[in-house]
Amino acid sequence: MGLAGYYRRFVPNFSSIAKPLTRLLEKGVPFVWSGDCEVSYQSLKSKLVDAPILALPESGKRFTVYTDASRIGLGCVLMQEGRVIAYGSRQLRKHEGNYPTHDLELAAVVFALKSWRHYLYGEACDIFTDHKSLKYIFTQKELN
């Protein structure tokens, strides 16, 4: 998983696809290669050999960040003028599985901003999420 994980930013939904394989690497879990593992392996293999269509970021142009969260993981896409710059995803940590939905959605936003801070620092960007309660946070000038 190490080398495949290195390319995770170029594979959309990497963490969801790789979940059956990463479960095999958990401590105390017997290594049993199931049908889900085979499907996951073949899917990752095909996605890693296909060249992703990514664009280089252009300075001075506005970035757009799309985020989403589920009970499995966090995902995000960085775009500029409708072109994909990068993908990001990760599986939830054990304690994050207990988070309420609005916290998971906010965690996806934080994950995206941390992952792409080198692109976004000092730049204007639009952030899109599918959770309406986060709209309040983004419209406040000051948060306590």
Feature-to-residue mapping (PLM):
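C-terminal reverse transcriptase regions that engage the nucleic-acid substrate
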Residues: 1-61, 133
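Mobile genetic element proteins and their domesticated derivatives, centered on retroelements
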Residues: 2, 21, 44, 68, ...
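Metal-dependent nuclease catalytic cores in nucleic-acid-processing enzymes
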Residues: 4-7, 105-122
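Two-metal-ion RNase H-like nuclease active-site motif
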Residues: 62-69
